[in-house]
Regions:
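Metal-dependent amide/peptide-bond hydrolase catalytic core
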Residues: 1-184
Length: 184
């Protein structure tokens, strides 16, 4: 269904070392992001099916080796803790500095492991760190998505100050709120 999105990124393709020698093998590094485990399974199965079919169609002498190197649980924020901590962070930083996302982002992130492994609620948030002039210019041009580099982009370069201070203030607000609540 159209609501079951998936992102498949080919992060690296490595084959051979010389322009005039046909390599024996190739390495394809793929990242898959989904919001649903059933969708994730279908996507991974499709990748396996396609890779095996392409190897077979090309007459490869051996079947491809497919290895999962990293696999993390889906990152799902606990709704009640998200609302609670957003309130605590707003109180600390001000309403104008806390923005809730309208829709989930398919981040490639291992943070989901913490709540899943320990069986506790977890909340993941972003701290904006873009140079204010760069952001303002991109926003005025209606090009934030195109011109503002995000995590994992080679041009991503957060401004250290006040980003670090803001992140620490947000974390302190969240921790104090959680401790004051008795972690209920």
């Amino acid at each position: 269904a159209a609501t079951e999105s998936a992102v498949v990124t080919i992060g690296a393709l490595q084959a051979g070392t010389k322009d005039n020698v046909i390599p024996d093998d190739a390495l394809l590094r793929i990242n898959v992001r989904t919001f649903d485990t059933a969708v994730r399974t279908r996507v991974l199965d499709a990748i396996t099916r396609i890779v095996k079919a392409e190897a077979d169609a090309s007459g490869a002498p051996t079947p491809p080796t497919i290895t999962t190197t990293e696999h993390y649980p889906l990152l799902r924020n606990d709704p009640s803790w998200s609302a609670r901590l957003a309130g605590a962070i707003r109180k600390q930083l001000g309403d104008d500095r806390v923005h809730e996302l309208a829709a989930p982002i398919s981040a490639s992130e291992d943070f989901g492991s913490f709540g899943t492994e320990w069986g506790v609620p977890s909340v993941f948030w972003y701290v904006g760190g873009t140079d204010p002039d760069l952001y303002r210019t991109a926003e005025q041009a209606g090009r934030v998505a195109q011109d503002v580099p995000t995590n994992h982009n080679p041009r991503f370069a957060p401004v250290i100050h006040p980003t670090l201070e803001t992140g620490v203030q947000a974390m302190i607000a969240a921790v104090l709120d959680a401790l004051e609540s008795g972690l209920r």
